[in-house]
UniProtKB/Swiss-Prot annotation:
Composition-biased stretches (Polar residues): 127-142, 163-176, 798-810
Protein name from the UniProt record: Eisosome protein 1
Region (Disordered): 13-44, 120-176, 708-843
Phylogenetic lineage: Eukaryota, Fungi, Dikarya, Ascomycota, Saccharomycotina
Biased composition (Basic residues): 33-44
GO terms under cellular component: plasma membrane
Residue ranges, compositional bias (Basic and acidic residues): 781-797
Modified residues (Phosphothreonine): T720
GO biological process, one term: eisosome assembly
Listed InterPro entries: Eisosome1
Keyword field: Acetylation, Cell membrane, Membrane, Phosphoprotein
Function: Required for normal formation of eisosomes, large cytoplasmic protein assemblies that localize to specialized domains on plasma membrane and mark the site of endocytosis.
Organism annotation: Saccharomyces cerevisiae (strain VIN 13) (Baker's yeast)
Membrane topology reported for the UniProt record: Peripheral membrane protein
Length: 843
């Protein structure tokens, strides 16, 4: 089979565009159909394959190499290939693996960075022969395994191993053979423009690099403005000679070097050495000075070296005079002196009449000429590389010879592969014929088996149908006899059913009449029982309802009394606060009066005033004491009244709570009796179970009714008793008030006229309540203990009578409230005040 085919250049672009989604047979049929239907519009390309497929790129590549037409990887024939430089190498590998499907030539599973990585690694390993695996007659499984081993990493290692060192290229050109990847790697290293992919991905912009480049560019522009470069205005090839124009300027140093017959390069070297040594010396001096200063700072108490101190002083003066006018004048003087020296020296006479200088100039010109002719007859390859034509031919032969060697090797491998394919096809056809004969025998045997089984099934079907028909006839006859027997039995049962229905209807009528009569009698009896039970229930529940009403009324009265007591308590608290305020005012007046008495005593001793003026002052003191005693008496009575009312309010609250619990208990007992009565009436009993009632309540229902009747009588008589008690209390109060007024009028001993006026004013300010009048009269009337005892007993009687009138049922003894009264202590304090007044009178 020949690899030669006349494929035109316009058909190259359509190679590799067929789809490889299925097997080889599907691709063949689809290509045939597409060729048949598209024969009118498209020109059928010339092919060498019998299946109608297009030529592969590998076949076209080998054909072009054979006829001297080299297809470079740098060309843009990248249909279905991600990297154009790896196309030829991948095609050769696929042809070596004997991949016969169209899908293999898409080259979608190669890493485009393989050759790039190989070219960047650089040439280190050199091979004499290309990597070509020997073809052998193996099965398709070994080929697939070998294909799976081919990976981008292996391709990179191959490409890396194929590279060669450029330094040893001239000596090893004839004895080495290289693969196709060497050419692609060289091309990829030479020009980066060919490495573009079919669909390049957009790269992200690195702003840091952009900013760094902008800064560098700005710095370079500023430097160019400040230090402009001298341009070369001569035509021709641009060289770097214009940059060295200032190298041989006629300075004093240059002229001294010329006169001393020293070469310019050596002079420059000497100058550089001197400069470096001066810098080193200055740096060492700087370090020494820094060390000395550090030692000075570490030990401030020690003496400093005079030289160091002198240098430091000079440095300070120098720093202070950097911007002074003296420094500027010295600099200007130095510049003027240097200009005068330059003007006085005749450089032209020294330059053009000196033979040694001319010889040195000729030597320099010759050396520069040799430097210029260094790259004569050489080609600039770019990047500062100049090569001779001989070197270029050697490099080109070294690059092309391995390619041609590998092409010849691949051609031999292809011929061996064609022979192996022919042998395989022959063996496959032979096995296919054997398989077809086996299939024919299987089909004939299957037909025979089908006919025999069909005949057997027919015979079995006939015998089974006959058996089923006989059994069905016997079953029908047997069922007919059973049906006749059941029909006779059905007629007998129907006649019996009619007679039974008539009998049952008659019995139902009789039973219904009897039940109606019994229901009427039972309804009348139930109505009588209900009326009797209601009457009995009303009689039993009447005392409970009465108790409940009485308890609620009593609770209401107690609540009203509690509200009144609370109002009285608040009023008394306000009065107590007022009295305390007045007492504090009287105390302040007493203190002022005492101070005044002391002053008056002093004046009396000094001036000897009369007794009348002294008595008048003492009478004022007595009036104030009387007012204070009066307010204290009112305060004590109101405090006693307040505490008594608080006790009464607490008692009323407890009693109201007790009444509430009793009401709840009576309600519960009433509900219990009602429930027991309902249970007894539901059971049909005439009376309640008295034993159970006694266990629950503690007495029988009759006893409970009699007890509640006596309580009702007591509750009815309670208002009349309370009225009588209140009338008796009022009479007692009037008698006590009359007796107190007599005692206050007859038994009171007047202290002075001012004391009488105080008692009259105190009696005029008394409140309407009789208790307050009596207490005030007792405390303001005199010095005797009998009056105080009477007032205390009177307050006790009032509290006892009030409790008897308000709460008749309260059992609190009057002796339990004695500790709340503070009249005795106040009376004693009044006596002490009066004794003090009498002592002053005696003085």
């Amino acid at each position: 089979m020949s690899l030669i085919s006349a494929v035109e250049d316009r058909d190259i672009h359509n190679i590799g565009k067929t789809s490889g989604g299925g097997s080889r047979t599907s691709s063949i049929t689809s290509s045939k159909k597409s060729l048949k239907h598209g024969s009118k519009s498209l020109r059928k390309p010339k092919v060498y394959q019998t299946t109608g497929e297009l030529l592969s790129r590998e076949a076209l590549y080998k054909a072009k190499l054979k006829y001297g037409v080299y297809q470079s990887p740098a060309q843009s024939y990248s249909i279905g290939v991600s990297d154009a430089h790896a196309a030829s190498d991948k095609a050769a590998n696929l042809a070596h693996d004997n991949q016969t499907t169209v899908e293999a030539y898409k080259r979608m599973f190669i890493d485009p960075n393989a050759t790039k990585a190989a070219s960047k690694m650089g040439p280190k390993v050199v091979r004499n022969n290309s990597i070509t695996s020997a073809t052998s007659k193996t099965s398709x499984e070994s080929q697939t395994k070998r294909k799976s081993k081919e990976s981008p990493g292996a391709a990179a290692s191959k490409a890396y191993s194929m590279t060669m060192e450029t330094t040893s290229l001239s000596s090893q050109t004839n004895s080495r053979s290289y693969s196709i990847t060497s050419a692609s790697s060289v091309l990829s290293g030479a020009s980066g423009s060919f490495n573009s992919t079919v669909n390049p991905k957009p790269k992200t912009l690195n702003l840091e690099k952009v900013l760094v480049g902008a800064e560098k560019k700005a710095e370079s522009r500023i430097k160019e403005r400040w230090e402009p470069e001298k341009t070369n205005f001569q035509y021709g090839v641009k060289t770097d000679e214009h940059g060295n124009l200032n190298q041989f300027s006629f300075s004093n140093e240059m002229m001294n070097n010329i006169m001393a017959k020293v070469d310019a390069p050596k002079a420059q070297d000497l100058q550089k050495v001197k400069k470096v040594s001066a810098e080193k010396e200055a740096k060492s001096m700087k370090f020494a000075l820094g060390a000395a200063n550090a030692v000075k700072d570490m030990h401030p108490g020690e003496d400093i070296d005079k030289s160091i101190a002198l240098k430091a002083q000079k440095r300070e003066t120098y720093l202070s005079q950097l911007t002074s006018q003296q420094v500027l004048t010295l600099a200007r003087a130095n510049v003027d002196r240097q200009l005068d020296i330059i003007e006085k020296s005749d450089m032209h006479r020294k330059l053009f009449t000196n033979m040694e200088y001319n010889k040195a100039a000729v030597a320099v010109a010759q050396s520069n000429h040799q430097k210029k002719t260094e790259f004569h007859n050489k080609i600039n390859m770019g990047g500062g590389l100049f090569l001779s034509p001989e070197d270029i031919t050697k490099i080109a032969s070294g690059l092309i010879s391995p390619v041609l060697g590998e092409v010849s090797e691949r051609a031999e491998a292809q011929r061996a592969m064609d022979e192996e394919i022919a042998e395989r096809t022959e063996a496959y056809n032979k096995s296919l014929n054997e398989w077809e004969t086996m299939e024919r025998s299987i089909i004939s045997n299957d037909a025979k088996v089908l006919t025999t089984t069909a005949n057997r099934h027919q015979t079995e079907k006939k015998t089974s149908q006959e058996k089923i028909k006989a059994s069905f006839d016997a079953l029908v006859a047997r069922m007919d006899t059973k049906v006749a027997e059941r029909e006779t039995l059905l007629e007998d049962t129907k006649s019996k059913e009619i007679e039974f229905k008539k009998q049952m209807q008659q019995e139902l009528k009789d039973e219904k009449a009897r039940l109606d009569q019994d229901l009427e009698e039972w309804g009348k009896k139930c109505e009588q029982d209900i009326t009797e039970a209601r009457k009995e229930q009303e009689e039993l529940l009447k005392p409970y309802h009465d108790d409940l009403a009485n308890a609620e009324a009593e609770h209401k009265t107690l609540v009203e009394e509690r509200d009144x007591i609370n109002a009285e308590i608040s009023r008394l608290q306000d009065a107590i606060v007022d009295h305390k305020r007045k007492i504090s005012g009287y105390g302040n007046d007493l203190d002022a009066q005492k101070n005044r008495n002391i002053r008056e005593d002093d004046k009396l001793l000094e001036l000897g005033q009369t007794k009348e003026s002294l008595e008048s002052h003492l009478n004022d003191d007595v009036i104030i004491l009387a007012n204070k005693a009066k307010e204290q008496a009112e305060l004590s009575t109101k405090e006693a009244r307040l505490k008594q009312l608080e006790v009464d309010s607490l008692i009323n609250e407890r009693k109201s709570e007790l009444n509430a619990t009793x009401i709840e208990l009576k309600k519960e007992k009433l509900x219990l009796l009602e429930a027991m009565k309902d249970v007894a009436s539901a059971r049909g009993d005439d009376k309640i179970d008295e034993e159970k009632v006694k266990k629950l309540i503690g007495m029988t229902s009759e006893e409970y009714l009699t007890q509640n009747k006596s309580v009702e009588k007591n509750v009815e008589d309670l208002p009349t008793q309370l009225e009588x008690i209140e009338e008796g209390d009022e009479l007692k109060k009037e008698e006590i008030v009359g007796a107190e007024t007599k005692n206050s009028g007859g038994d009171g001993v007047p202290v002075s006229t001012a004391a009488k006026e105080a008692t009259e004013t105190s009696s005029a300010v008394q409140t309407k309540e009789p208790e307050e009048k009596i207490s005030i009269g007792n405390k303001s009337s005199g010095k005797e203990d009998a009056n105080d005892c009477k007032s205390a007993e009177h307050s006790k009687e009032i509290s006892v009578s009030q409790k008897a009138g308000n709460n008749k049922s309260l059992g609190v003894s009057p002796d339990s409230l004695e500790h709340t009264f503070s009249g005795f202590s106040q009376g004693s304090s009044i006596e002490d005040d009066q004794d003090a007044i009498s002592n002053q009178e005696k003085k």
